[in-house]
Amino acid sequence: MKKKIRLASVLFMATLFLLACTSPETAEEQNENIHIVTSMFPVYEITKEIAGDQADISVMVGANEDAHHYEPSAKAVASVNEADVFIYSSDEMEFWVESLLAVVENDDLTVVESQG
């Protein structure tokens, strides 16, 4: 009888030890930053200043590219599909945004026009 109690106690203690050593959150759960895609570099810079380290921010049109003549690549469309927020300047500045959003399949995407 004492052996059974001792064995049960050891198993119980081992279980508690293992449970105490496990992490309740995975690395993905710990990184809860929102993913923001911006259309061009000035919008990226402003967004970066506002969001700080609370968001992962990427830019579609680089600093040395022309936003008027930009054509979104498949990689850019995929990036917007995976984003939480897409921020662009205006329809007049980036006429390609309308066609981009037409092919994006992310129903949870928040789209922000930063005009003005």
Language-model segment annotations:
Residues K4-S9, A20-G116:
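Extracytoplasmic metal-acquisition and chelation regions
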Residues F12-L18:
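Hydrophobic core
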